[in-house]
Curated annotation (Swiss-Prot):
Family: Belongs to the herpesviridae small capsomere-interacting protein family.
Source organism, top-level taxon: Viruses
Quaternary structure and partners: Interacts with the major capsid protein/MCP.
S-adenosyl-L-methionine keyword on record: no
Name this polypeptide is given: Small capsomere-interacting protein
Encoding gene, per UniProt annotation: SCP
Example of a GO biological process term: viral process
Pfam families registered for this protein in UniProt: Herpes_capsid
Disulfide bonds: none
Biased composition (Low complexity): 100-120
GO CC aspect terms: host cell nucleus; viral capsid
Amino acid sequence: MHRLRVTDPVVQGKLEESDSTHELVKRLEILPQNNMTPEEYTLMKRNYLVFLIAQYNFDQYIETTHGIKRKKHIEGLKANLKPSALSADSASLSGLLSTSLTTPSLSSTPTSLTSMPGLSISGPSTTDTIDSKKKPKAK
């Protein structure tokens, strides 16, 4: 039964000693102690450090193999935008949406569209559905 327990990872060196300004150190420092004993907190910090290093290495690998990271890219774009520009954009967008959300009735549809043969405004016909394009299964 003793082999079922997951062994603790071997951590060689400390991240704090290698680079005290690294982003992982900042994330490690915000780990709350809550009601853990100092020994439990030390073990939790070590395990969290292993997780952060693994996550950081995986993110670096994904970034180099698959291009830019979307989350990092979006955060960079948001940082470059001014807060006043964001509020102005949201106000203009809400005004644009409120004017464009009026639903046209059938009477406002141009007569050139309603008089076209084969044009169905009521909905898709059965020949246009995806199910009709499927091949029958062989038995």
